[in-house]
UniProtKB/Swiss-Prot annotation:
Compositional bias annotation for Basic residues: 537-548, 558-568
Primary localization: virion
Keywords: Capsid protein, Disulfide bond, Host nucleus, Host-virus interaction, Late protein, T=7 icosahedral capsid protein, Viral attachment to host cell, Viral penetration into host cytoplasm, Virion, Virus endocytosis by host, Virus entry into host cell
Amino-acid biosynthesis among keywords: no
Family indicated by similarity: Belongs to the papillomaviridae L1 protein family.
SUPFAM superfamilies, alphabetized: Group I dsDNA viruses (SSF88648)
Gene that specifies this protein: L1
The name this protein goes by in its record: Major capsid protein L1
Function: Forms an icosahedral capsid with a T=7 symmetry and a 50 nm diameter. The capsid is composed of 72 pentamers linked to each other by disulfide bonds and associated with L2 proteins. Binds to heparan sulfate proteoglycans on cell surface of basal layer keratinocytes to provide initial virion attachment. This binding mediates a conformational change in the virus capsid that facilitates efficient infection. The virion enters the host cell via endocytosis. During virus trafficking, L1 protein dissociates from the viral DNA and the genomic DNA is released to the host nucleus.
Pfam family, one: Late_protein_L1
Length: 568
């Protein structure tokens, strides 16, 4: 029914004709005539609209709802909020100085010398291109003798250390240490070569030495720093590798330990599994793993324990350009070159490798032997030393001089030089000094704080003598009295005690500072710098001198001179 007819029906009270409870009754004649006339008018309107191809009266359309065909995205799940340590750690006004003694190490710069042949003990490998990872042990502040015991309540609070300043002292003069290989895989000088060697079957290795990339690095945190390197991956079973095929690569993350090799300019990779010739790189890394700090992962650490802050400086350039001898595993496509008519007719080795160099060594851009103050860490941990420990990862290749030592095989020393009568040795020495400023902080043990710390690291509460009881058991357990007796069945071996130290199997340089804390900041170089930086005044050690009391024989005040007028 058209809209016009509906209006007329409502106007002339004809709506009851369509009601279900309507009882028929006679209608007036004029009402029936009016109703028929308007129905005819609506029919003419419909015929008029049907003559148009693309036009249809809107009152004959029906609205139909259809669901959208687009993808419906659900809201992302909520992310657990990580709280900054400043929100629940309250600093105090008490600062301590702690410093290590002079830390020295000596060894062979290229490899470890095993015991034997006159050596009663192994000579370690000590190179300037190794990570030095110091694990600094701090005293427990909750068991520490404090000058003021009213700064915290042991029933509702706990004490922690926060690192406020650090200075890493570095000894020994600047120098350039060389590394090399007596059988280095060096084929051609591809920078200035006139004729390349195409077919090589004999041994063309040579004795080559290089100076590595310069690196200065310092990472401070309460957890070990994380490194990355490329290692040999696992091939799929559907695509097995044949002998001589290039193995797949896999990026691995490991903890940076003391003695690990840094990136020297040849890449961060496992050379022991990815280079079977043992002559592609110098001696000190040909069977080692060179690691590079994974700054991306440490920066993304939700709690920020592995890196409070970091300092780094790297410098490198290529000195020589060589290629490698051997069969090319990846053949050069013929579309990339035109065959020659003379020698060489086919392309030679296309595996190119530079010799790295760190260039000039200078003291103008040194990162060490200067203080650093920690005001705001890059992560959520603002210098709080959980578990009363601190990890300092250091690399400094600027004082990398290798000492050459020669000893005569005859006594006395022969008067005429003969190289066969002298033994040559190489040693590398390193010298460090660690100085810290620690601030004493308190943590109020509310339910929310303890719940958050337990979710972050439950072992922290265990160190504070808080434990979670195991769930009660309802089963009956048999307990024998004489466990070692042969009269009873063999009992199960007791479970080994859990190792509370998660870094027990890792290698670090342990530095114990539990007995080297001092409140006398002005007695140490770093402490005096901190007092100046913080605007604090040092405590007077010598009191002011007292004025001497006046003696009993003190003369009286001189009388004033009286002027006498002369008489006229």
């Amino acid at each position: 029914m058209c809209l016009y007819t509906r209006v007329l029906i409502l106007h002339y009270h004809l709506l009851p004709l369509y009601g279900p409870l309507y009882h028929p009754r006679p209608l007036p004649l004029h009402s029936i005539l009016v109703y028929m006339v308007h129905i005819i008018i609506c029919g003419h309107y419909i015929i008029l609209f049907l003559r148009n191809v693309n036009v249809f009266p809107i009152f004959l359309q029906m609205a139909l709802w259809r669901p959208s065909d687009n993808t419906v995205y659900l809201p992302p799940p909520s992310v657990a909020r990580v709280v900054n340590t400043d929100d629940y750690v309250t600093p105090t006004s008490i600062f301590y100085h702690a410093g290590s003694s002079r830390l020295l190490t000596v060894g062979n710069p290229y490899f470890r010398v095993p015991a034997g042949g006159g050596n009663k003990q192994d000579i370690p490998k000590v190179s300037a291109y190794q990570y030095r990872v110091f694990r600094v042990q701090l005293p427990d502040p909750n068991k520490f003798g404090l000058p003021d015991t009213s700064i915290y309540n042991p029933e509702t609070q706990r004490l922690v250390w926060a690192c406020a300043g650090v200075e890493i002292g570095r000894g020994q003069p600047l120098g350039v240490g060389l590394s090399g290989h007596p059988f280095y895989n060096k084929l051609d000088d591809t920078e200035s070569s006139h004729a390349a060697t195409s077919n090589v079957s004999e041994d063309v290795r040579d004795n080559v030495s290089v100076d590595y990339k310069q690196t200065q690095l310092c990472i401070l945190g309460c957890a070990p720093a994380i490194g990355e390197h490329w290692a040999k991956g696992t091939a799929c079973k559907s695509r097995p590798l044949s002998q001589g095929d290039c193995p797949p690569l896999e990026l691995k993350n490991t903890v940076l330990e003391d003695g690990d090799m840094v990136d020297t300019g040849y890449g961060a990779m496992d050379f022991s599994t990815l280079q079977d010739t043992k002559c592609e790189v110098p001696l000190d890394i040909c069977q080692s793993i060179c690691k590079y700090p994974d700054y991306l992962q440490m920066s993304a650490d939700p709690y920020g324990d592995s890196m409070f802050f970091c300092l780094r400086r790297e410098q490198l350039f290529a000195r020589h350009f060589w290629n490698r001898a051997g069969t090319m595993g990846d053949t050069v496509p013929q579309s990339l070159y035109i065959k020659g008519t003379g020698m060489p007719a086919s392309p030679g080795s296309c595996v190119y490798s530079p010799s790295p160099s760190g260039s000039i060594v200078t003291s103008d851009s040194q990162l060490f032997n200067k203080p650093y103050w920690l005001h705001k860490a890059q992560g959520h941990n603002n210098g709080v030393c959980w578990h009363n420990q601190l990890f300092v990862t250091v690399v400094d290749t600027t004082p990398s001089t290798n000492l050459t030592i020669c000893a005569s095989t005859q006594s006395p020393v022969p008067g005429q030089y003969d190289a066969t009568k002298f033994k040559q040795y190489s040693r590398h020495v390193e010298e460090y000094d660690l100085q810290f400023i620690f601030q004493l902080c308190t943590i109020t043990l509310t339910a929310d704080v303890m719940s958050y710390i337990h979710s972050m690291n439950s072992s922290i509460l265990e160190d504070w003598n808080f434990g979670v009881p195991p769930p009660p058991t309802t089963s009956l357990v048999d307990t024998y009295r004489f466990v070692q007796s042969v009269a009873i069945t063999c009992q199960k071996d007791a479970a080994p005690a859990e190792n509370k130290d998660p870094y027990d199997k890792l290698k670090f340089w342990n530095v114990d500072l539990k007995e080297k804390f001092s409140l006398d900041l002005d007695q140490y170089p770093l402490g005096r710098k901190f007092l100046v930086q913080a605007g604090l005044r040092r405590k007077p050690t010598i009191g002011p001198r007292k004025r001497s009391a006046p003696s009993a024989t003190t003369s009286s005040k001189p009388a004033k001179r009286v002027r006498v007028r002369a008489r006229k």
